[in-house]
Amino acid sequence: MRFSLNLLTLALLSATGAVTAADFGIQHANTAKVKQAAYQCKQCKIPAVHTGSVTASLGYVDSSDSHAGNAFGTNDEGVVAGVDANVSYLNAEGYRSQLQAHQLGMDNGFVSARSGKIGEYKVELDYRNITTWQDEAQTQLWHHGGMLTPSESVRFVDLKLERQQAGLGFEYQINEDLNTYVRYDREDKTGSKSASLMSPRPINFAQPVDESTDKLSAGVVLSGANWMTDISYHGSQYKNNINHMSLPYAYDVYAATPDNQAHQLAVAGQYRLDATVLNGRVVAGRMIQDDNLIQVAGNPLQNWDGQVDTLDAKLAATSMLTPRLRVGGSVDYSKRDNDSSVYEFMQPRLSYDPLSNSFKQNTVLDIERQTVKLNTAYRLAQGYRLQAGYDYKQVERSYGEREQTRDNTLWAELDIRKFDTVRFEIKASHGIRGGSAYEASELTSSEEQSLLRKFNLADRNRTELELGTQYTPANWMSLDLTVHYAIDSFDERKGDDTVLGLHESRDYGYDLNLNLFLSDNLTAYGFAGQQWIDSEQAGDQANIWYADINDSFINLGAGVAYSGLLDDRLTVGADYLFANSNGETLVDANLTGSTSYGDYYSFNHSVELYGEYALSESMQLKLAYQYERFYDTDASEVGVDAITGLTTLGLGNHNYNAHQLMLSFSYIL
């Protein structure tokens, strides 16, 4: 019989002494004199690994409306191309890199790269292009160098915004308890959007957009066995590259968005003590705006010396008192202190109060919030868990219509997991908002309608219910259903509540998701969701009027995929999506008759058919066809000169069919 013993084993055996008294536990082995480096496994080195895939796509788009670019990723007609990638690299020394890209080269795409050594450092680089299309506008105002020049010829402009975002970040781990990071981001936004001015009659025009935002974040993270602290700085600077706009016969008729900057210092941390976890944060910030102002008669200011200081603090705790009982709570405080300069305006038409016969100064507005949340969870029995909580929020506003509001909310949730195939979640909450006396704001006008209540400040009762269930009768089927209902009532509980304004609002709907794994080769899914929002409000324009506003939304979708064709090389599939939204407003004036105010209506059909064919283990072809049918109409939009004295950008409604055919080649690493 042959015995094969390596040198390390022989050394361990020789160090044990007499066989009769030996303890062969590895913890007693004496390896001090063993040259372990000479006996390392030469075949145990982990090789460098590349995983992922790279895809190049070439296609053709046929569309008569630029709005289709929101679905296809580009509004370019004709031939389009893009690159997708998801590649990772890892070697034995701990170096890791990752590259991700999606529709790179198209109007909506991104690329992201990460590289570094595990436990030491990481560098990240990101670029993203985001383009959104609204509609095509027609205008007779031409913009150049800050001047809006009227012209007899009509100019067609795409109302679209393009955002180019780039970021660079670096993380360095000094040791296992100390980590540092810094990141810089920049966004450039260009394009056109809808705007309005009076000159002397109302005119809608395509406002040019050319602005940039720079952001910088840096911080240090310290950690221990049961604690962690993050000390960081966050800053941003906004710059508008388009100044005030003028007409040939009137200067500075449209004020530009002012340049501004913001800075924050933050300290956040977490501490764990047995079954209790504490976490909190303190953030101090300052926002500054000191851009030039448009000069008008009676205005003594050349620029606005604006400054707002902010303070945010939060402390939260959660504790497992027993294996069945968990309790938690948080206290949140925020303050917005407006320290902008205060000036006295001597021009009567700007500052004169006809009731008090006095001149006034501009008033700075402050706001302060306190929020307290308490919650608990208790396991009633195996498979039954009850959660409940109380939320309190108080908001104080200076010089507002209502200086103080208080929200009190009680909520509860029952989670049932007793059964193998079905799970239930039942949630309910009830909230009441009250506060100080509601008075007309001195800043807005002391003659304001005393019966008018703004919905975000008025007394309100809110009740909300939600029921969710997950049903899995077999391993090839799963069904999720969620139903919700909420009602906001602005009733007259104290005789000082809403008479004019929003009276009541109901929000209810459902969401249904179905997943089917019919066989190893066949899968399917479907979903449906609907939402209804019904509101009642009243107003006063010569006569009291009442309005019912009904908004409804629906989303339907289904898909199927089958693999295993042509020797398991071919997979085919289809996806369908339908979306519809409808808004109706019915006005009843003095109960003398009802009038439709005008509706908004839109629907969208989207279909995708595709086939994927594996040329080999590392190469794959995909052919996909996508179709979109989109239609919308908005009664609030009118033609350019349909209303005397009003110039619009034309009808922006959509009604189009769009097609995209795309061939993709993928290489799998």
Give a label for each model feature.
Residues 1-22:
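Gram-negative bacterial Sec-dependent N-terminal signal peptides
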Residues 22-46, 59-669:
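Gram-negative and organellar
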